[in-house]
Amino acid sequence: MEGIQHPIPRTVEEVFSDFRGRRAGLIKALSTDVQKFYHQCDPEKENLCLYGLPNETWEVNLPVEEVPPELPEPALGINFARDGMQEKDWISLVAVHSDSWLISVAFYFGARFGFGKNERKRLFQMINDLPTIFEVVTGNAKQSKDQSANHNSSRSKSSGGKPRHSESHTKASKMSPPPRKEDESGDEDEDDEQGAVCGACGDNYGGDEFWICCDACEKWFHGKCVKITPAKAEHIKHYKCPSCTTSKKMKA
């Protein structure tokens, strides 16, 4: 297990950086690397845990033998429930436990290094500005407070799915940034676009980045997160993200 091989964060900024790194690794495990993660969680093995590491990687491993452990431990035995649930529900369950673990690690560091009321509040606000892992992997990522109400309302009132266009138009829109609503003002369009969240890493939309939309789950992804370039996307008629591709294979 990881022990304390990484630098120990001591300031609010360092603890938040540690949090973001671990979070990115966990999101990767439950989205772009989900097939690899699924196969590593063999129910025939002993109690396994999913660890997110500060360097944005992840690992499935046995819990540490040290008692009490140096850091709070993630949920034990996630592999035992794998075959007794729908894959989607199992991934969601692991995501919820992973969110809880991230918070416990962050505030463990806060307690260890004597964070006061204001420091704890600032740390929580920084963490709370990011979507939870559960929100990212289930496609329910929340935007910032001033955008969430209008943005989520407009999405829930949509007609349930993208309109069907010609194949050439579909291919073009697939590589475009998250779509704007034509009947909204320019400012609202900008807010809606900025509020879009990558289904893999959970980060918000950036105007200078290439994005692609999954035709199955209709989530948007950074091209770099799903290893798709603009040139490659030109030749894809119907794109499916790693999670949807894996789900289809599991059901086959």
Curated annotation (Swiss-Prot):
| Renumbered residue ranges of the record's region Disordered | 141-193
Specify the residue ranges making up the PHD-type zinc fingers: 195-247
What Pfam families does the annotation carry?
A: Alfin, PHD
Q: Which organism was this protein described from?
A: Arabidopsis thaliana
Composition bias, Acidic residues: 184-193
Question: Where is it expressed, tissue-wise?
Answer: Ubiquitously expressed.
The Swiss-Prot or TrEMBL record describes its family as follows: Belongs to the Alfin family.
Protein's UniProt keywords contain Transcription: yes
GO MF annotation terms: methylated histone binding; transcription cis-regulatory region binding; zinc ion binding
Q: Which Gene3D superfamilies match?
A: Zinc/RING finger domain, C3HC4 (zinc finger) (3.30.40.10)
The entry's stated outcome for W211M is: Abolishes binding to H3K4me2/3
On assembly, the entry states: Interacts with H3K4me3 and to a lesser extent with H3K4me2.
Name the GO terms of the biological process aspect.
chromatin organization; regulation of DNA-templated transcription
Protein name, as recorded: PHD finger protein ALFIN-LIKE 7
- Where in the cell does this protein reside? Nucleus
Its biological purpose: Histone-binding component that specifically recognizes H3 tails trimethylated on 'Lys-4' (H3K4me3), which mark transcription start sites of virtually all active genes.
GO annotations of cellular component type: nucleus
Keywords annotated in UniProt = Chromatin regulator, Metal-binding, Nucleus, Phosphoprotein, Transcription, Transcription regulation, Zinc, Zinc-finger
Sites annotated Histone H3K4me3 binding: Y205, W211, D215, W220
- Anything noted about its domains? The PHD-type zinc finger mediates the binding to H3K4me3.
Q: Which residues carry this modification: Phosphoserine?
A: S176
Bias class Low complexity marks the residues at 149-161
